[in-house]
Amino acid sequence: MRLSRYFLPILKENPKEAEIVSHRLMLRSGMIRQQSAGIYSWLPIGLKVLNKVCDIIREEQNRAGANEILMPTIQSADLWRESGRYDAYGKEMLRIQDRQERDMLFGPTNEEMVTDIFRSYVRSYKDLPLNLYHIQWKFRDEVRPRFGVMRSREFLMKDAYSFDLDYEGAKMAYYRMFVSYLRTFARVGLQAIPMRADTGPIGGDLSHEFIILAETGESQVFCDKAYLDLAVPGADTDFRNDAQLTDIVNRWTTPYAATDEMHDEADWSKVKPEDQVSARGIEVGHIFHFGTKYSEPMGAKVQGPDGKEHLVSMGSYGIGPSRLVAAAIEAFHDDAGIIWPKAIAPFGAGIVNMKPGDEGCDAVSEKIYEALTNAGVDPLLDDTDDRPGAKFATMDLIGLPTQVIVGPRGVAAGEVEIKDRKTGERQSLSVEAAINLLTAEA
């Protein structure tokens, strides 16, 4: 993409309404625009990042055996009355009526609808286990939306829902999602720590929040330093191997980890002082087993191997892709702007033509741009007439992993400069060496 043709509305000043780093940088870098309280438009560069996050989530859900569907944003109130949640949910639910005066709602979540889909088609235990997921916009009418897309009223969510014959089956479905989430966050470039969460009236221990450590985190968290060195399950993980999954979950739940709500001083005191990590954290995912909470009132049953009908045991598994984008910025930024992990960077590299109109600079910039494009690197070429200082500031702000600086002096010497956005390190290379370096990992 050429910057001269790209819609990138950069803000030079920090927006007054932005309270946290991610909100400020997302507005300044032209990723989002606020349309009303807690509601945002995603602009081209922001949407590219959001789509990359969704692609990774989708790949890992599919790898774990989940099936993608797409449920509507507008739901019938009748389904929610079946579960008993329509009147109990509160003012966060946006209730509406159609022209026939039928009660509808803008879905804040999808347990009722996915249970209705399941009960309409599945009759036998032979069709289990089953996991259905979708990535869809949600709306919750927060009293005080704040922090940009971190806590907005409209947000994108990946919801997965598992259906199993019994608790043992549901536990393995939970383990599959647990391991899938570890891989998902690692691929995005984040180190997420699973922390035991409240299970409410359901009880048991199958509820975890996935937390990333960040100075601007919304909650206090406590964990054993051992988590920082745990190896994330590899691409060769067999999601059909219950023993392997159980071993992974055990390794990732044995050391101490808790949010302030679940913190236990007695257990915490058993962790060596030098291994105690007390920090701020951001929740980026939540998985939860809720048994027959929805299958019972909605009659979601299957015939078991004993010939009798059984209520299915269910779980839900959520990741907010829009929130995850903001969380990544909170984790990876400096005073100059965003520092994107390579996997979700909007462009693979930025090419800075220091002097558009100069025959040599134009030729070298075009050569690199064409080579990177053909190799699938997806570069952004700054071919604008902005001053060099403004060009560098823009590249640092939008956080592309690598910058290729093409200037008259370097071109005369047959070289370009490569800058690593994360480390700030610079190196001068021949044009061919620069192309080889940037295309080696494509």
From Swiss-Prot:
<dbReference type="InterPro" id="IPR004500">
    <property type="entry name" value="Pro-tRNA-synth_IIa_bac-type"/>
</dbReference>
<protein>
    <recommendedName>
        <fullName>Proline--tRNA ligase</fullName>
        <ecNumber>6.1.1.15</ecNumber>
    </recommendedName>
</protein>
<dbReference type="InterPro" id="IPR050062">
    <property type="entry name" value="Pro-tRNA_synthetase"/>
</dbReference>
<keyword id="KW-0547">Nucleotide-binding</keyword>
<dbReference type="InterPro" id="IPR044140">
    <property type="entry name" value="ProRS_anticodon_short"/>
</dbReference>
<keyword id="KW-0963">Cytoplasm</keyword>
<dbReference type="GO" id="GO:0005524">
    <property type="term" value="F:ATP binding"/>
</dbReference>
<dbReference type="InterPro" id="IPR033730">
    <property type="entry name" value="ProRS_core_prok"/>
</dbReference>
<dbReference type="GO" id="GO:0005829">
    <property type="term" value="C:cytosol"/>
</dbReference>
<comment type="function">
    <text>Catalyzes the attachment of proline to tRNA(Pro) in a two-step reaction: proline is first activated by ATP to form Pro-AMP and then transferred to the acceptor end of tRNA(Pro).</text>
</comment>
<comment type="subunit">
    <text>Homodimer.</text>
</comment>
<dbReference type="InterPro" id="IPR036621">
    <property type="entry name" value="Anticodon-bd_dom_sf"/>
</dbReference>
<keyword id="KW-0030">Aminoacyl-tRNA synthetase</keyword>
<dbReference type="GO" id="GO:0006433">
    <property type="term" value="P:prolyl-tRNA aminoacylation"/>
</dbReference>
<dbReference type="Pfam" id="PF03129">
    <property type="entry name" value="HGTP_anticodon"/>
</dbReference>
<dbReference type="InterPro" id="IPR002314">
    <property type="entry name" value="aa-tRNA-synt_IIb"/>
</dbReference>
<dbReference type="InterPro" id="IPR002316">
    <property type="entry name" value="Pro-tRNA-ligase_IIa"/>
</dbReference>
<dbReference type="InterPro" id="IPR023716">
    <property type="entry name" value="Prolyl-tRNA_ligase_IIa_type2"/>
</dbReference>
<keyword id="KW-0436">Ligase</keyword>
<dbReference type="InterPro" id="IPR006195">
    <property type="entry name" value="aa-tRNA-synth_II"/>
</dbReference>
<dbReference type="InterPro" id="IPR004154">
    <property type="entry name" value="Anticodon-bd"/>
</dbReference>
<dbReference type="Pfam" id="PF00587">
    <property type="entry name" value="tRNA-synt_2b"/>
</dbReference>
<dbReference type="InterPro" id="IPR045864">
    <property type="entry name" value="aa-tRNA-synth_II/BPL/LPL"/>
</dbReference>
<keyword id="KW-0648">Protein biosynthesis</keyword>
<comment type="similarity">
    <text>Belongs to the class-II aminoacyl-tRNA synthetase family. ProS type 2 subfamily.</text>
</comment>
<keyword id="KW-0067">ATP-binding</keyword>
<dbReference type="GO" id="GO:0004827">
    <property type="term" value="F:proline-tRNA ligase activity"/>
</dbReference>
